[in-house]
Amino acid sequence: LQQYNLASNIKGIRYAGNVGDPVFAAADGQVVYAADGLKEYGNLVLVKHINGYITAYAHNSKLNVKSGQNVTAGQKIAEMGSSGTTRTMLEFQVRLDGKPVNPASVLPNS
């Protein structure tokens, strides 16, 4: 849908999909936030990883995890939706020390 582009205020990768499509954790970690308190991100999951990275999964229709829960890579953590936006999508972000990092630069090629 849209690639990382800080000039356009796109701080991650936006993937198109259908309401209810599964959202999977990118790597092992601990859920540090799973709620809808940040309006622009809708239902949001934040996962902290041992290497200092935090991954964010925004605009979900349903959250399958809770704060404090440990997750493994590939585990279903949410379902895609359109909360906080006008179309169904997953906005996937990676942050290091609070700053956005291009997800393509840290994820393995598939």
What is the role of each PLM region?
Residues 12-16, 44-49, 91-93:
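Short, acidic/hydrophobic/Gly-rich beta-strand patch recurrent on exposed beta strands
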Residues 69-110:
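Conserved, short, structured surface segments that act as functional micro-motifs
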Residues 34, 50-74:
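Short histidine-centered loop motifs in beta-beta connectors
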Residues 3-6, 43-55:
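Short, basic/aromatic beta-hairpin or loop at an interaction surface
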